């Protein structure tokens, strides 16, 4: 959602500010990791795939690499994954609500409502383990 200047690396325009926030950097990591907790066949889900066979790093590998690069102590990202999933549930519900009200901004808004339940179930499953 950014337009770059073709002659340089300067940003000419930012097109989407609604989710633009300055927050804890671990929240970005939680967002990056959430697909590992969503079952395959669901929206962007990786859970159930053989990640090693697909050459996709595990959660532990990603967290270790992230912490190494950021020079921070390795930590459990569960809180941030749950936060990200909860945030996505709210976004998906909002898109679906706009569809129901006839104000959708996406041609697949009707289908997005189907994604709420798998996200909610994945989130609940993680929370139960805490």
Where does each model-flagged region fall?
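Short, hydrophobic secondary-structure boundary micro-motifs
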Residues: 41-45, 75-76, 108
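Active-site acidic catalytic loop and adjacent metal/ATP-binding pocket
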Residues: 1-27, 31-33
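All-alpha amphipathic helical-bundle segments outside canonical DNA-binding/catalytic cores
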Residues: 72-84
